[in-house]
């Protein structure tokens, strides 16, 4: 079987764009660091082309055997393609047992067919990090953080349920305590009075503000008839021509005595005439009859 059978042809279109983007992520400085590390451990020269020197899998198998003796039982020195692929497969299995995560490991074709050298480099960096974690002196990669396990007694765990974490905020200021669901009935009362049951709905809680100033007391639904009068006079409901003092001042210009548009108006002075009277038909307009409301005497 010839080696040309395993080599892919040039990529075109979208495949070429993907291959170029992967090639742009390749770090040549890290390649030099990996070269020095592998050559220092194995004692073998990789060659001018880093990936071509690793393609047969021989150096990779010897490398993992140095880090973890006995990882690869047999290293194939043959130049046959399937032997080289077998070496790469044995290396992948060995580093998996060594502790490298599966998502950090390249596939055999990424190296053998030159499809993704960036992933091969990432795998070697992950292997360096794992070797550093295990105590090997490596100048490449970063050391993985060690687990810091903590064991708590069941009583401590139960006590933690009664504590409000700072991430939940504070309960010392204004809150939604006492709020009910939208549309449900609310009972308003002053909890300082010491009453167990809420009072009637006409009682306004001090938490809702004061009802000593202007309010909407006596307001009716839109469109209904309104009876306006002065409750301080002790009178019952008067006609709608009298305006209550709660509606403002009636000493200046006002709409006092105004009626609905189109209705007759009764105009008189309440200081002199308690009830309005109208002149009879044919009677002079300016006589001094007692019931005449034009009389100003």
From Swiss-Prot:
InterPro entries, A to Z: Calponin-like (IPR050606), Calponin/LIMCH1 (IPR001997), Calponin_repeat (IPR000557), CH_dom (IPR001715), CH_dom_sf (IPR036872), SM22_calponin (IPR003096)
One BP annotation, GO: actomyosin structure organization
Coiled-coil residues: none
Phosphoserine modification, residue list: 175
Cited SUPFAM superfamilies: Calponin-homology domain, CH-domain
Role description: Thin filament-associated protein that is implicated in the regulation and modulation of smooth muscle contraction. It is capable of binding to actin, calmodulin and tropomyosin. The interaction of calponin with actin inhibits the actomyosin Mg-ATPase activity.
The name this protein goes by in its record: Calponin-1
Annotated source species: Sus scrofa
Gene from which this protein is expressed: CNN1
